[in-house]
C-alpha cells in the first residue's frame, strides 16, 4: 500500500489549495476555463484507485470496495457540477472561492466514505457541511439565499446535537466507536436498549443530509434560495456521503429489528410526504426539493432490507439518482434568466426554443419516475426486489403507489416543455455545453439499458460488508 492509494483525496485536496491560492491572488482571474478539466482528472484518479485496499489512522480510515466506489461517484458528481457552473453564462462570473468551497465540501465527503470509526465519521461529516454553510447564502442581494443559509445552519446545528447525544449513548453501551466492533454485538432493543436509542439518534445526522422525513424541512427552502449551481450540488453530492455511511451502519443491523423497522417506516412516510408536497409546486427547484425527500424514502428500501442485495441496490440507486438529478438541474440552470428560479411555466415551448434541452429534461423526468429504459427504473427494480425478498411487502406496495403519484408532477414538466406555447426567444448555448448535457442524458439511458457492470461493482462492495 502506497500514498497513491489516497490519490482521489490528495488530488481534491490539491485542487482546494490551488483554488485557495487563486482566491487570495491579486489577479482575480476566472477559473472556469481550467477547473472542469481539473475536476475530470479527479475522476480518472478515482478510477485509478478503485481497486486499492488498506487502512490508515489506526484502522479508523479504511479503503475498501464501498469507499472507492463512492469516491468515484463523488468525483464524478463534482466534475459534473463544476462543468455546469463553469459552462453557464452566470457561472463564468463565479469567483475562485466559490469553487474552493465546493471542492472542500466534496473532499470532506470523500473522507467520509472511508471513515469506519464514529468520531472520525462525525468530523468528516462536519467538514463537508461547514463549507456549505458559507456557500448557500452566496447569491448576491437575494434575501431568500440568506434565509436558506440560516435555515440550513439552524437545522444542521440541531441535528448535530442529536447525533452527538446518540454517539455518547453508543459509546456508553458498547465501549467502542469502531464499526467492526459494533458489528460484532447485538443490536436488538431487548439486549441493548441504550445502544439502539443512540444509533437512532446518531443516524439523524445522516437523515438530515439525505433530506429524509422528518429531517427534510430545510430541503425545499434551501434549493429555492441557493444559486442554481449550488442547488445542483446540494441536491446530489452530499446525498452520496449520507448513503455510504448509512450503508455501513445498516449492514450490521439484521432485518426486522427495531432500527430497520424505523428505517422502513421513515422511508414510507418520506416517500408519501415528498410526493404529495411536490404535486402543488410551481417553482422547479422547490419541486425537485420535495422530489429529493421522496427519493430518500426509496433509498430506505435497500437499507431496511439489510441484505447484501439491499446494500448493493442502495449504492446503485445513489448513482442513478445523481445522474438523473444532475440532468434535471442542468436544464434548470440552462433556462434560468439572470440566475432567477425558473417555474414550470418557463418550460413552455421548450421543444421549439431548445429541442436538446427538452430532450434532456424528458430523459431526466422519465428516470425520476422510474420508467424503462432509464437508470431510475433499474435502480427502483433492484430496491423493490431486495425489500420484497426480505418480507417488506407492505413497503414495496407503498413505494409502487408513490411512484404512481410521482408520475403527475414529473410528467407535468415534460407536458409543459412539449405542449405548452411561449413567445420567449430561442435559448442559444455553445455546442460543447449542449453536448455535455446530452452526455448526461445518454448515461441515464445507458445505465438503464446496461446496469449489470456498475451493479456488479456495487455488489462486490456490499459483499465485503456481508461476507
UniProtKB/Swiss-Prot annotation:
Complex and partners: NDH-1 is composed of 14 different subunits. Subunits NuoA, H, J, K, L, M, N constitute the membrane sector of the complex.
EC number from the UniProt entry: 7.1.1.-
Gene: nuoN2
UniProt feature coiled coil, ranges: none
GO molecular function, one term: quinone binding
Compartments it resides in: Cell inner membrane
EC class: translocase
Keyword terms of this UniProt record: Cell inner membrane, Cell membrane, Membrane, NAD, Quinone, Translocase, Transmembrane, Transmembrane helix, Transport, Ubiquinone
Family, per entry: Belongs to the complex I subunit 2 family.
Membrane spanning residue stretches: 1-21, 31-51, 66-86, 99-119, 153-173, 195-215, 231-253, 258-280, 287-307, 315-335, 357-377, 394-414, 434-454
Known function: NDH-1 shuttles electrons from NADH, via FMN and iron-sulfur (Fe-S) centers, to quinones in the respiratory chain. The immediate electron acceptor for the enzyme in this species is believed to be ubiquinone. Couples the redox reaction to proton translocation (for every two electrons transferred, four hydrogen ions are translocated across the cytoplasmic membrane), and thus conserves the redox energy in a proton gradient.
Protein name, UniProt field: NADH-quinone oxidoreductase subunit N 2
Catalysed transformations (reactions): a quinone + NADH + 5 H(+)(in) = a quinol + NAD(+) + 4 H(+)(out)
Species of provenance: Solidesulfovibrio magneticus (strain ATCC 700980 / DSM 13731 / RS-1)
GO biological process: ATP synthesis coupled electron transport
HAMAP family: NDH1_NuoN_1
A Pfam cross-reference name: Proton_antipo_M
Membrane topology annotation: Multi-pass membrane protein
InterPro entries linked to this entry: NADH-Q_OxRdtase_suN/2 (IPR010096), ND/Mrp_TM (IPR001750)
A GO CC term assigned to this protein in UniProt: plasma membrane
Amino acid at each position: 500500500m502506497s500514498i497513491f492509494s489516497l490519490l482521489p483525496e490528495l488530488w481534491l485536496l490539491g485542487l482546494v489549495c490551488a483554488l485557495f491560492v487563486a482566491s487570495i491572488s491579486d489577479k482575480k482571474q476566472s477559473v472556469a476555463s481550467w477547473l472542469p478539466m481539473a475536476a475530470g482528472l479527479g475522476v480518472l484518479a478515482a478510477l485509478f484507485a478503485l481497486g486499492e485496499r488498506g487502512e490508515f489512522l489506526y484502522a479508523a480510515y479504511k479503503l475498501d470496495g464501498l469507499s472507492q466506489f463512492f469516491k468515484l461517484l463523488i468525483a464524478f458528481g463534482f466534475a459534473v457540477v463544476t462543468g455546469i457552473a463553469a459552462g453557464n453564462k452566470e457561472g463564468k462570473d463565479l469567483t475562485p472561492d466559490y469553487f474552493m468551497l465546493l471542492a472542500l465540501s466534496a473532499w470532506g465527503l470523500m473522507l467520509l466514505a472511508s471513515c469506519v470509526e464514529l468520531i472520525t465519521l462525525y468530523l468528516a461529516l462536519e467538514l463537508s457541511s461547514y463549507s456549505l454553510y458559507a456557500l448557500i447564502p452566496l447569491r448576491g442581494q437575494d434575501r431568500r439565499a440568506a434565509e436558506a443559509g440560516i435555515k440550513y445552519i439552524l437545522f444542521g446545528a440541531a441535528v448535530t446535537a442529536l447525533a452527538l447525544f446518540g454517539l455518547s449513548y453508543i459509546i456508553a453501551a458498547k465501549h467502542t466507536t469502531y464499526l467492526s466492533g459494533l458489528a460484532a454485538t447485538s443490536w436488538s432493543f431487548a439486549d441493548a436498549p441504550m445502544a439502539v436509542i443512540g444509533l437512532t439518534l446518531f443516524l439523524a445526522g445522516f437523515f438530515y443530509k439525505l433530506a429524509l422525513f422528518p429531517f427534510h424541512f430545510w430541503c425545499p427552502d434551501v434549493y429555492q434560495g441557493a444559486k442554481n449551481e449550488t442547488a445542483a450540488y446540494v441536491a446530489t453530492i452530499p446525498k452520496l456521503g449520507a448513503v455510504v455511511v448509512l450503508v455501513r451502519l445498516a449492514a450490521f443491523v439484521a432485518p426486522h429489528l427495531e432500527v430497520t423497522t424505523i428505517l422502513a417506516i421513515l422511508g414510507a412516510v418520506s416517500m408519501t410526504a415528498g410526493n404529495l408536497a411536490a404535486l402543488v409546486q410551481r417553482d422547479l427547484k422547490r419541486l425537485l426539493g420535495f422530489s429529493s425527500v421522496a427519493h430518500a424514502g426509496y433509498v430506505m428500501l435497500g437499507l431496511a432490507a439489510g441484505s447484501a442485495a439491499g446494500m448493493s441496490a442502495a449504492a446503485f440507486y445513489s448513482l442513478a439518482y445523481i445522474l438523473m438529478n444532475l440532468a434535471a438541474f442542468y436544464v434548470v440552470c440552462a433556462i434560468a434568466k439572470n440566475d432567477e428560479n425558473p417555474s414550470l411555466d418557463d418550460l413552455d415551448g421548450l421543444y421549439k426554443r431548445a429541442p436538446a434541452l427538452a430532450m434532456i429534461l424528458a430523459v431526466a423526468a422519465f428516470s425520476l419516475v422510474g420508467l424503462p429504459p432509464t437508470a431510475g427504473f433499474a435502480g427502483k427494480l433492484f430496491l423493490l426486489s431486495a425489500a420484497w425478498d426480505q418480507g417488506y411487502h407492505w413497503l414495496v406496495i407503498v413505494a409502487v403507489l408513490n411512484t404512481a403519484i410521482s408520475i403527475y408532477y414529473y410528467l407535468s414538466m415534460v407536458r409543459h416543455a412539449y405542449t405548452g406555447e411561449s413567445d420567449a426567444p430561442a435559448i442559444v448555448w455553445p455546442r460543447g455545453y449542449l453536448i455535455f448535457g446530452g452526455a448526461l442524458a445518454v448515461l441515464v439511458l445507458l445505465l438503464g439499458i446496461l446496469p449489470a457492470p456498475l451493479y456488479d461493482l456495487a455488489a462486490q462492495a456490499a459483499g465485503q460488508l456481508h461476507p
